[in-house]
UniProtKB/Swiss-Prot annotation:
The keyword RNA-binding applies. The lineage of its organism: Bacteria, Bacillati, Actinomycetota, Actinomycetes, Micrococcales. Keywords: Ribonucleoprotein, Ribosomal protein, RNA-binding, rRNA-binding. This is Large ribosomal subunit protein uL24. GO terms for molecular function: rRNA binding; structural constituent of ribosome. It comes from the Bacteria. Part of the 50S ribosomal subunit. It comes from Arthrobacter sp. (strain FB24). GO terms for biological process: translation. One of two assembly initiator proteins, it binds directly to the 5'-end of the 23S rRNA, where it nucleates assembly of the 50S subunit. InterPro entries: KOW, Rib_uL2_dom2, Ribosomal_uL24, Ribosomal_uL24_KOW, Translation_prot_SH3-like_sf. Belongs to the universal ribosomal protein uL24 family. GO terms for cellular component: ribonucleoprotein complex; ribosome. It holds the Pfam family ribosomal_L24.
Length: 119
């Protein structure tokens, strides 16, 4: 089970400070997780300018130009935000026994290390 999933609120914990033009300390929602490269795409974080070549789309409209998009960031540079305290926290796991249709199953639940509450 992954510690960070799509839709989680994370905070950047490394890099340049926000007052110096960096993203450290900023919080954002995870848009996509790339498990093969250990990277995440976070909303509003690591924005870069992308220069695309001018061409034509199938509708005949001109495409291309300069656009600002989010680039991925390594998963070790972000920390999950505890929903109760709104501060970054480490993630742990706890197993719970759940009974469905008369069958017992063990389910792993993500837990915030700082507060001990479920995420």
């Amino acid at each position: 089970m992954a510690k960070i999933k799509k839709g989680d609120l994370v905070q950047v914990i490394t890099g340049a400070k926000a007052e110096r033009g960096g993203d450290r300390g900023k919080q954002g929602k995870v848009l996509r997780v790339f498990p093969d490269t250990n990277r995440v795409l976070v909303e509003g974080i690591n924005r870069v300018t992308k220069h695309t070549k001018v061409g034509q789309s199938q509708r005949g409209t001109k495409t291309g130009g300069i656009e600002v998009v989010e680039a991925s960031i390594h998963i070790s540079n972000v920390a999950l935000v505890d929903p109760s305290t709104k501060k970054p926290t480490r993630v742990g796991f706890r197993t719970e026994t759940v009974e469905r249709n008369g069958k017992k199953r063990e389910v792993r639940v993500r837990v915030a290390k700082s507060s001990g509450k479920d995420i």
